[in-house]
Swiss-Prot record:
Residues 828-857, 868-881 have a biased composition (Acidic residues). It comes from Arabidopsis thaliana. Residues 70-84, 882-897 have a biased composition (Polar residues). GO terms for molecular function: mRNA binding. Residues 62-89, 101-123, 824-907 are annotated as: Disordered. Transmembrane segments: none annotated. This is CRM-domain containing factor CFM3B, chloroplastic.
Length: 907
């Protein structure tokens, strides 16, 4: 018996006895639970039952007296509730037989509650379906067999009432449905896809959104049969032509044309930077070769020699080619009424201009006129760069322009009154945005001799605010920064932006057109001419006043010369100025003689000249001596300060003495230990800190698993390495086996001994900690540098004393070459002495109270370095364990070059 979800479970009286008992038991159970609805579990489904007014038929006579009272209460409650009939729920699940039976799955029942139990509210999906059927969006025939013909009332405050959309803007009504009208008055949702019938009409049933939005030029030009044939031919073609990073050059185009003579298909393999944008390479190949790309996958392209028209030339205008090709396309392409976007088929976007099939006016006359004007302008600037990988128009090849233009000068500029020379932020941003979409005007590949490019840019600036220069890829020894500076210097323009691909120049607010510049230059030349004439007139007027007194001046000059000869022993000449009171003496000989007599000395005396030279030599020598003495005193002061700091650091350093009761080993054992130690992969690296507590701790940790330990020391000399080895032997208690020279420095092999016992304290207390060892290393380095500096100053001072003695020898005749050499050698500025402070003491105080818990890196047995320190140092004091031969930071103390040689095993 099929049970529909909208029917109520009311068994008829004509049933069998078994069914009657089932109904009686069912009614008694309903009376017992006082429920308005119930459900019976059947596997994973539940039967929903609703009770109407005829629920009174379910008798409860078999129950006890207590159950009869409960039945009366239940009937009274049932009369008050007056349950409404439930709605039909549209079940779109696969198991439709359960929905026909009124069965709802367990997971649905958990979400929707007792949908079939007679509740007044229905599911939201049912309301949506009813609304769609009401306005004709859903066909009612498919639900006709499943529906129950009964009246349905919209309950107040129901979900459907809340789901209702008012008839207003954005609403949903019959006059203005929430959709669009098709060609046959069919209402379509905006998001509704194309139907199967329309898909078949479009592209033989193979419709995709990608094909709908974008078609290749080959698909629109060739038929489907021809395209499939060409692709089959392409797959049988094995040979491929490589296109390198230079792109589609003229040589590549010629090679493709040559291959087309023997085959109609050419397969290409794109490599390098050109493979980063295959869509762009697709367009470039079609534009330059005149062929059609019939297949493209990854970096592989198949190019077809299309001979559909004689007007398809690879070197012609790209836009005009595409427009003519699009006009020859068949106009019988199917159209769809679904959406306006389906009717538009876009060609490949060339030069960022969409080309639409069926649109006759693809570009406005203004755009075509602008392109023709730019093309004509670039043709007048110079030869084109035919290997340009971008779009149309082709830029001018700046490398073919003359490098040097005779008589070239930067253009004349004049800033208008009240105009700022700099660009504002908004203006610069606007110009940069314009330059982003503009094609480049020039293609440049050299960094020098750019006068020809500057001349062409000035011509371009007559009609354009911006000049865009593209940098050729793959050109060696080119620097965009240098290019930009040279162009800016030659043209006077303003650099807007610079990157690895383009240079953008703004002509500037002071740029003048050719006519205006020539007019202003003529005016400026006229002003200069007038100024020159005025100056000459002034000079003529002043000379007219001086001419009458020329003879008097000549006589005065003779008189002064006579007096000068008479009074030559005297140092000063006191000429008479009474005769000059009535003369114009500015710039005359009399004025010069008067000034010489008052403030000048007689330099004609050779003795006076020699005396002055000797005085200069003495002053120069004394100055050099004082400078070196000051340097020497300052260096000695710093050295004393470094000695105090080093002594302060070494207060806690108490090195152990060499043991006299060492355990001896035979020569055979020493040889074997040396051989085994040099072959060990695990080693301990001794850094610039030298031997401190962490070094000894690592040695004991190493001896826990091995009898030998190999320590690498980068000392300058063998004596320094031996000094470090003896310190390691004394502090660790081991037996020194050997010190060998290897490619990485020196290898110190230490044997732990036959009666070795691990000490209770691995870190000895008489050595420095890690931080104090670093501070000590820095102070040693500073002291060593000061010692070398003092030695250099002393050497220079001795050299200076020898030179002073040489000056005494040439006292009668000055040696100018000697003092010039001294000036070059000692031309450094005088150093200012530093005040005595406690900066170093403050630095050293940071190492006073450090804990003893600083641990050094452990030893790694796989050959990796267990660094006790960052780098090696060999600067040690008298109580140090390293090499005291040099400092680790001065040029004289650089480490010996590592030698790639075999281990030298010493017997």
């Amino acid at each position: 018996m099929a049970i529909n979800s909208s029917h109520h479970f009311c068994p008829m009286t004509t049933t069998t006895t078994t069914s009657a008992k089932f109904v009686d038991s069912l009614g008694s159970s309903f009376c017992k639970f006082h429920g308005t609805s119930s459900s019976i579990s059947l596997r994973s489904y539940r039967f929903g039952f609703s009770f109407m007014k005829n629920v009174k038929r379910l008798s409860c006579e078999g129950s006890s007296s207590s159950s009869s009272s409960r039945n009366e209460n239940w009937n009274r409650t049932q009369k008050q509730n007056q349950f409404r009939p439930s709605k039909v729920v549209l079940n779109r699940r696969k198991d439709e037989r359960f929905s026909d039976l009124g069965v709802i799955s367990g997971e649905n029942s958990s979400r929707s509650g007792d949908v079939g139990g007679g509740s007044g509210s229905s599911s939201t999906m049912e309301k949506i379906v009813e609304k769609l059927k009401k306005y004709g969006f859903v066909d009612e025939d498919q639900f006709q067999d499943k529906e129950v013909e009964q009246e349905r009332r919209i309950e107040k405050s129901s979900v459907e009432e809340r789901f209702y959309v008012e008839e207003r803007r954005g609403g949903f009504s019959e006059e203005s449905p929430f959709g669009v009208y098709g060609g046959n008055d069919e209402v379509k949702f905006p998001w509704e896809k194309v139907s199967s019938m329309e898909k078949k009409e479009l592209v033989n049933g193979e419709w995709t959104a990608k094909k709908e939005s974008r078609y290749s030029l080959a698909e629109m030009t060739l038929s489907e049969f021809e395209l499939n044939r060409l692709r089959n031919v392409m797959f049988r073609t094995k040979s491929k032509m490589r296109v390198t990073g230079a792109g589609v050059t003229q040589a590549v185009v010629d090679a493709i044309q040559e291959k087309w003579k023997g085959s109609e298909i050419v397969r290409l393999k794109i490599e390098g930077s050109s493979a980063l944008n295959m869509r762009r390479m697709h367009e470039i190949l079609e534009r330059k070769t005149g062929g059609l790309v019939i297949w493209r996958s990854g970096t592989s392209i198949a190019l077809y020699n299309y001979k559909g028209g004689s007007n398809r030339d690879g070197s012609g205008n790209m836009n005009k080619q595409v427009y003519r090709r699009a006009e020859r396309l068949p106009s019988s392409l199917p159209t769809s009424t679904v959406d306006q976007s389906v009717q538009l088929v876009n060609l490949p976007q060339l030069e960022k201009e969409p080309t639409v099939v069926g649109n006759k006016d693809r570009t406005s006359p203004q755009e075509v006129e602008y392109e023709d004007e730019i093309n004509e302008l670039l043709e007048g600037l110079g030869p084109r760069y035919t290997d340009w990988q971008g779009g149309y128009p082709l830029p001018v090849d700046a490398d073919l322009l003359p490098g040097i233009v005779p008589g070239y000068e930067p253009p004349f500029r004049a800033l208008p009154y009240g105009v700022r020379s700099t660009l504002g932020t908004k203006e610069a941003t606007s110009l940069r945005r314009i330059a982003t979409v503009l094609p480049p005007h020039f293609a440049l590949g050299r960094s020098r001799q750019l006068q020809g490019l500057a001349t062409a840019m000035v011509k371009l600036w007559q009609k354009s605010l911006i000049a865009k220069v593209a940098l050729k890829r793959g050109v060696q020894l080119t620097t965009s920064e240098r290019m930009a500076e040279d162009i800016k210097r030659l043209t006077g323009g303003m650099l807007l932006s610079r990157n690895k691909d383009f240079l953008v120049f703004y002509r500037g607010k002071s740029f003048l057109s050719l006519e205006v510049g020539e007019a202003l230059m003529e005016k400026e030349m006229l002003v200069r001419t007038l100024q020159d004439e005025e100056e000459q007139a002034r000079l003529r007027a002043s000379s007219a006043l001086v001419v009458p007194s020329i003879k008097a001046n000549q006589q005065l000059a003779r008189t002064l010369q006579d007096k000068e000869e008479q009074a030559r022993p005297s140092a000063l000449v006191l000429p008479s100025t009474k005769a000059n009171q009535n003369l114009v003496s500015a710039g005359t000989l009399g004025e010069t003689l008067d000034a010489t007599g008052k403030w000048g000395k007689n330099l004609d005396n050779d003795d006076h000249v020699e005396e002055m030279k000797q005085e200069v030599e003495k002053v120069r020598s004394a100055k050099l001596v004082r400078k070196l003495e000051r340097k020497l005193a300052f260096a000695e002061k710093k050295l004393l300060k470094a000695e105090r700091a080093l002594a302060k650091v070494e207060e806690s350093l108490k090195p152990a003495e060499q043991r006299t009761d060492l355990e001896g080993i035979t020569e055979e054992e020493r040889f074997m230990f040396q051989k085994l130690g040099l072959k060990m992969k695990a080693f301990l690296l001794l850094g610039r800190r030298g031997v401190f507590d962490g070094t000894v701790e690592n040695m004991h940790l190493h001896w826990k698993y091995r009898e030998l330990i190999k320590i690498l020391v980068k000392a300058k000399t063998l004596e320094g390495a031996q000094k470090v080895a003896m310190a390691l032997e004394a502090e660790s208690g081991g037996i020194l086996v050997s010190v060998d020279k290897i490619s990485k420095g020196y290898a110190v092999i230490v044997y732990r001994g036959k009666d070795y016992k691990r000490p209770t304290t691995l870190r000895p207390k008489n050595l420095l900690t890690k931080r104090k060892a670093l501070a000590r290393s820095l102070e040693l380095q500073k002291r060593e540098a000061l010692i070398k500096h003092i030695e250099a100053i002393q050497t220079r001072s001795e050299q200076l004393r020898a030179e002073i003695e040489q000056v005494e020898l040439v006292k009668d005749k000055g040696d100018e070459t000697l003092y010039d050499k001294l000036d070059m050698a000692y031309s450094s500025d005088e150093e200012t002495e530093e005040t005595d402070g406690e900066e170093d003491d403050v630095y050293l105080d940071t190492y006073e109270d450090e804990g003893e818990d600083d641990e050094e890196g452990g030893i790694q047995a796989n050959g990796s370095l267990s660094e006790t320190d960052v780098e090696f140092g060999s600067d040690e004091s008298d109580t140090d364990f390293g090499d005291n031969s040099a400092s680790s930071t001065t040029p004289e103390t650089t480490f010996v070059e590592l030698q790639n040689e075999e281990l030298d095993v010493q017997p």
